[in-house]
Amino acid sequence: MKVNFFRQESGTEPVRSWLKSLSPLERRLIGQDIKTVQWGWPLGMPLVRRLGGSLWEIRTVLPGKIARVVFCTRDDRIILLHGFIKKTQKAPKKDIALAKQRMRRL
């Protein structure tokens, strides 16, 4: 499968920007997990979890924190919709809502 970043009308790619804000180690760990999903799709827990419908999350354990990259699949593409550092037990509703909003705009 091919991996694409969600692109806003302005041309910005929020997940790419978010990844660039992280440390090199964090980017590498998240990138490895994205590549694992790309080449091994479909995958399940503990790396990938379905959030509902066609929305999924990649779950990456980083030093001292946990990252999530929310994505959907279209045809033979994985589209990275939103990325965030998880601070609570459940995924924040606002982050899931934002990913769903972006998915509807595809």
Describe each model-derived feature in a short phrase:
Residues 1-66, 74-78, 85-106:
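Basic, Lys/Arg-enriched alpha-helical interface segments
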